[in-house]
Swiss-Prot record:
This is Protease HtpX homolog. Residues 288-303 have a biased composition (Low complexity). Belongs to the peptidase M48B family. Its cofactor is Zn(2+). NCBIfam families: PRK01345.1, PRK03001.1. The chain crosses the membrane at residues 16-36, 145-165, 172-192. CDD domains: M48B_HtpX_like. Its main location: membrane. It comes from the Bacteria.
Length: 315
């Protein structure tokens, strides 16, 4: 995604925020909303990683507490030409992962316990390579800023509906227009998230496949995570749906209306794109849908396949 398009999308989110402010407090409300949006962006720039990681109860690990995971991240970060990010684990049964941080020097990769327990080493490597691709593409800051502003738009819109908006406009079309904008603004914010997310996910899939060297490792992981997301709820994501687009697979994808406003491209389309990429990069990797565990005989193996599979998320 070009920097110009990204800037325009973020400007659109800010304009929605100002529009809600205007409906609540007139011109002064719009000005306050602009100042608040600017302050939020500055605050998010410096605190984005701590905010999101704290929200999901992520715990930082090192080579002593999670040696296999940390070594895998270090190996893949080296292949990607990135500094070593901090590594976190979230105690959550849904297999999923995200990356955050304002730049590659201050990045973090977080995975759930469900991801480590349900995926093979090769699939896990594909997921981590995908998240490192987000870091390399500088997507991590954009994802967090978008989530922050979109969440604020929803919150302020609900506040405006509760208090009835700007009372000077509370008759005739003014009231109808105010209510319409307060209802539609959060939907508009979701559409902006979709526009950003769809493009960056395809790009991260391709770069992640190149980093790990086997597109089918990531393709297999995507299929497994997508199936689990329809069955295993992510309670923290339910409480903060504006952060759903940060994950490799939408953690809300099995929940009603979220399918109509999906923040991610179709998983099947992503898998198909990775299958096409296999011919260019070479190697078939793991077959989609196979049980988690070591690579089958004859399939390309990762540097981590020679060791026994870890029994828990910390090994």
């Amino acid at each position: 995604m070009s920097y110009f398009k990204t800037a325009m999308l973020l400007a659109g989110l800010t304009a929605l925020f100002m529009g809600i402010g205007y409906l609540i407090g007139g011109a002064s409300g719009a000005l306050i909303a602009l100042v608040v949006a600017a302050a939020m962006n500055v605050f998010t720039y410096w605190n984005s990683d701590r905010m999101v990681l704290s929200m999901y109860g992520a715990q930082e690990v090192d080579v002593r507490s999670a040696p296999d995971l940390v070594r895998m991240v270090a190996e893949l970060a080296g292949r990607a030409g990135l500094p070593m990010p901090r590594v976190f684990i979230m105690d959550n049964p849904q297999p999923n992962a995200f990356a955050t941080g304002r730049n590659p020097e201050n990045a973090a990769v977080a995975v759930t316990t469900g991801l480590m327990q349900q995926l093979s080493r090769e699939e896990l490597a594909g997921v981590i390579a995908h998240e490192l691709a987000h870091v390399k593409n500088h997507d991590t800051l954009l994802m967090t800023i978008t989530a922050t502003i979109a969440g604020a738009i929803s919150m302020v819109a609900q506040f405006g509906m509760f208090f009835g908006g700007n009372r000077e406009n509370n008759n005739g079309p003014g009231l109808i227009g105010s209510l319409a904008l307060m209802i539609l603004a959060p939907l508009g914010a979701m559409l902006v998230q979709m526009a950003i997310s769809r493009t960056r996910e395809y790009a991260a899939d391709e770069m992640g496949a190149r980093i790990c060297g086997q597109p089918m490792w990531l393709a297999s992981a995507l299929g497994r995570i997508d199936a689990a997301a329809h069955q295993v709820p992510n309670v923290e994501a339910e409480r903060a749906p504006a952060t759903a687009h940060m994950f490799i697979i939408n953690p809300l994808s099995g929940q009603g209306m979220d399918n109509l406003f999906a923040t991610h491209p179709s998983t099947q389309n992503r898998i198909a794109a990775l299958q096409r990429l296999t011919g260019e990069i070479g190697g078939g990797g793991a077959s989609i849908g196979r049980p988690a565990g070591p690579s089958p005989r004859g399939a390309p193996r990762s540097p981590w396949s020679g060791q026994p599979r870890a029994r828990g998320p910390w090994g």
